Every structure is written in structure tokens, then in C-alpha cells.
Amino acid sequence: GLTFTDCHMPQTEAADGATYTHHNMTQSPLENPAALEKCLTCHKSQGVEDADAMVTFVKGKMDELAQIQQATKTKLDEFHAKLAEVVAAGNADETKLQAAKDAYNLANVYFLYQGTAMRPTDGSMATMNFSKSVEQLQKADDAIAEGMAQIA
């Protein structure tokens, strides 16, 4: 697998032919020709032909993940609102209510973990591990469904 430095700090060739480590690690790899070349060492075998196609591929995955993230976020917000409504009504079965609260907390952890707490819905984690992010979102969705069933 790749590491942060493989993508954000690739080996770059200077004008004199010397190889050095690119140190602008805050730059998006999508804006760095050396980083895109590193991507293509694997992705060419998947039909991604050049740097422009690589950027299109990555942005497509980011958009796809952002849509899944936003759908989960909407469910999580609806679950939170339903929990608040049930608590305010004051007549819920305490065991079921606690199970629902626990499910909400678990779903929220999965949701925040998959995208980092700072950027949970922008799709940027697609480049790090798309399938793991989707897996975490599915776990969040499952916990939401289980919790909502407790207070339905």
C-alpha cells in the first residue's frame, strides 16, 4: 500500500537530474504532476490512461463518497431529531430509549471516524480508502436503523 509521503511528498527530479523529495505536502496530489505519475503506476492497469484521467477518476470517487456521506448524515440528523422528540415526550420505555441512544452514539462514531471529524461529508477520504469509508458508513447506517427501530 501507499503512505502519505508517497502521494503528498513524491520523489521528484530536479532540472539537473538529481532526485529529491517534494516537500510541499499541503498541496493536493491532484495538482502535482509527480504525484499523479505515482498514481498512474497502478491505475494505468485499471484503464486510467493519463494525469487528466486520473484527476477525473479521483474526483468521481470523491463525489461518489460525498453523496454516501451526505445520505448517512441526513439519516443521523433525522435520528437525532427523533430521539429528542421521544425524550421530550417523556413516555418512552427506558430500556429501548437507552438502546436507541447507544445506537446513535455508535452511528455517530462510525460517521465521524470514516471521514475524520473535521471533514465528514466532503468525500476527500475517498483517496485514502474508499472501501473502508463506505464500510464505516454502512455500519453507521445499520446502527441508525437499529436505533430507530427501538423508538419507532
What do these predicted regions represent?
Residues 1-6, 10-151:
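Primarily the internal scaffold of c-type cytochrome electron-transfer domains
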